[in-house]
A protein has these predicted regions:
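N-terminal lobe/hinge region of extracytoplasmic solute-binding protein
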Residues: 23-113, 120, 143, 212
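Detector for C-terminal structural segments
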Residues: 24-29, 62-64, 77-80, 84, ...
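Gly/Pro-rich hinge or "lid" segments in bacterial periplasmic/extracellular proteins
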Residues: 65, 85-96, 143, 187-247, ...
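Aromatic-rich, solvent-exposed beta-strand/loop patch
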Residues: 102-106, 128, 133, 174-193, ...
Length: 605
């Protein structure tokens, strides 16, 4: 990275910024937090095998169905893998946080006041139909998303004044007001659409045929709703870029769809697909047996990791009147007996989720630090009192299944919230309405973990109905916020990033990421402060912990559990690098061993 003073250079692309007073930073990497790990001349990432062969086929299983190939559509269920058809301007490795290296973009220049940024497009960049990727395509992509993309996109990038092709291979982003995070985000992760393909199509609508992509894999076969097969392109333009060395090692990738997870597991054991990451503790403990295991054809591994954990829970839609009171939400947390479930259903494999930054230094523990208090004290009148006086912990039982003490606490909280028990039915004192709600699910395995909660809620006089729908209906109801409760997960947060705006800020209340429907001025303030302080790691630490505390004590979900290992079973034909990336299992770095494959039954070679 180097700084250069802008001057009048005739026909150079810096002409537009010649009179600016800010310095210009020229670089090949963009890092949201800290310094980039890899130098400008790096050859490959540390967690890949640069000599990995490009060979063989891998098949994965998916639950449900799909009906189109447009990952960006506002309705429908896109095919598995369709989101990877397009390369992004830059690429983020799995062993760093928010650092991006050249892919479609080969070089970046920006003013150090973050009012503008220019990207040079790699002259070799091509779409899968052979046509070059140009700055016009980048300009088109931004405008397409701003006019036809989801509302959250328009809101997130409203500070972007323009994205303009100033040269066939140079695009300039200008901000209406300087904003480092939005400027970098747009430059880093934009997946570039081919203008010649999309200009007469609506981005918001489903796509019945595979689009023209730019990534390493292209759709070569599909049966809508049942399977889709991608093939590695022999003439993929970016195969030798440092970000791709040692990656994309399967010649074909196929996704097959199954009715539910139980059927899919049996198909895996029978040899219908190759790799399965297990989410069910019961299946992992008791179902991975049989002839193919005895013969050594299938390998079962628990791979330990220290990656940040997702925040999984039964999520309340607090836009629903029944869940608008925090006391009601807290009361229901006492109805989940994690200790009994872990012992009797999960074979003691899990730890209890308690944080939105689980397994990171940003997890709020103990009482607020001095720096946290500096942030939180001015907001004291708008924050639950216990943020300042207690460390949050989910309710704990003795694991016996007898939770009378916990239910007594729940009864008291419900009473304080205006509810009373009448003829064994929890009833609102003013309205006379019975306490009932619906848990929306799409998987039988989710129903299994919901039933114990349902039974305990029944003891409180609360009727939780479990409503199972197919994946298409589920996605529609999620987008429409047509649900009372979901069993869902907030993605793992390795650090407090600007993405937290979309997840928690009220400006993005319509985002499907804001599962709970949170609209809280304190949460707004904290997420906006986090977005504004990305250059200051010392400020992000107390801000992240402060946000964690506020979210914890508002009881937006009934916390479930997490696992500090990857549970994965494979038909034993794969090899992987000796180093695993810190933040991912790294399946895109695995390869098929021709020698090992020959030892397997023919359909799994």
């Amino acid at each position: 990275m180097r700084k250069i003073k802008p001057t009048l250079l005739g026909v150079t692309v810096l002409l537009m910024s010649a009179l600016a007073t800010a310095d210009v930073v020229e670089t090949t990497t963009l890092s949201g937090v800290g310094q980039a790990k890899y130098p400008a001349n790096f050859s490959h990432f540390d967690y890949v095998n640069p000599s990995a062969p490009k060979y063989g086929k891998v098949t994965y299983g998916e639950v449900g169905t799909y009906d189109n190939f447009n990952r960006f559509a506002s309705r429908g269920a896109p095919a598995a893998g369709s989101g990877e058809l397009y390369d992004s301007l830059m690429f983020a490795p799995s062993d760093e946080i928010d650092t991006y290296y050249p892919l479609i973009a080969s070089k970046v220049r920006y003013s150090d006041d973050y009012s503008w940024l220019e990207l040079d497009i790699n002259s070799n960049a091509r779409f899968q139909d052979g046509k070059p990727i140009t700055a016009q395509d980048v300009e088109f992509t931004f405008n397409k998303f701003m006019t036809e993309g989801v509302p959250q996109y328009r809101l997130f990038y409203k500070a972007v004044k323009s994205v303009t092709a100033i040269h066939p291979l140079t695009v300039r982003i200008e901000m209406s007001e300087p904003n480092r995070e939005k400027l970098f985000s747009l430059a880093q992760s934009t997946q570039v659409l081919p203008k010649h393909y999309w200009q007469d199509k609506n981005l918001a609508e489903p796509l019945n045929e595979p689009p023209v992509g730019s990534g390493p894999y292209k759709v070569v076969r599909y049966q809508t709703g049942q399977s889709v097969t991608y093939e590695l392109q022999k003439d993929y333009w970016a195969v030798n870029l440092p970000v791709n060395i040692g990656r994309h090692n399967f010649k074909q990738i196929q996704y097959d769809y199954y009715r539910d997870d139980t059927v899919m597991l049996e198909a895996f054991k029978a040899g219908e697909f190759d790799i399965r990451q297990e989410s069910s503790a019961k299946f992992w403990a008791s179902s991975y047996t049989g002839l193919n295991f005895d013969k050594g054809f299938i390998k079962k591994e628990a791979i330990a990791h220290n990656s940040p954990a997702s925040t999984q829970g039964f999520v309340f839609n607090i836009q629903r009147e029944v869940f608008s009171d925090p006391k009601v939400r807290e009361a229901l947390t006492y109805a989940m007996d994690f200790e009994w479930m872990n012992k009797n259903m999960f074979y003691d494999q899990y730890s209890r989720t308690r944080s939105y930054f689980q397994n990171t230094e940003y997890e709020a523990k103990g009482l607020p630090s001095t720096d946290e208090l500096t942030i939180l004290t001015p907001l004291k009148d708008k924050i639950p009192e216990r943020v300042f006086t207690q460390e949050y912990q989910p309710p704990v039982t003795d694991g016996s299944g007898r939770i009378r003490q916990q239910l007594r606490v729940a009864f008291q909280l419900l009473k304080e919230a205006g509810w009373e028990l009448k003829d064994k039915v929890m009833t609102h004192k003013e309205t006379g309405k019975a306490f009932e709600f619906e848990l929306l699910i799409y998987s039988p395995t989710t129903e299994r973990i919901a039933i114990p909660l349902q039974k305990n809620l029944k003891q409180l006089g609360i009727d939780m109905k479990i409503r199972s729908v197919d994946t298409t209906q589920y996605l529609k109801r999620l987008r429409d916020r047509d649900f009372d409760m979901l069993s869902s997960a907030y993605a793992a947060n390795p650090y407090p990033s600007p993405n937290l705006l979309i997840i928690w800020n009220s400006n993005y209340i319509d985002s499907t990421y804001n599962r709970a429907g949170v609209a809280d001025p304190v949460v707004d303030f904290l997420t906006e402060q986090i977005a504004a302080n990305q250059e200051h790691p010392e400020k992000l630490l107390p801000l992240g912990r402060a946000l964690d505390r506020v979210l914890q004590w508002n009881f937006y979900l009934i916390p479930q559990w997490y696992l500090s290992q990857y549970r994965i079973a494979t038909w034993d034909k794969f090899e992987r690098p000796s180093v695993m990336p810190k933040y991912d299992i790294g399946l895109d770095t695995w390869w098929v061993s021709e020698q090992k494959a020959q030892l397997l039954p023919e359909k799994r070679r």
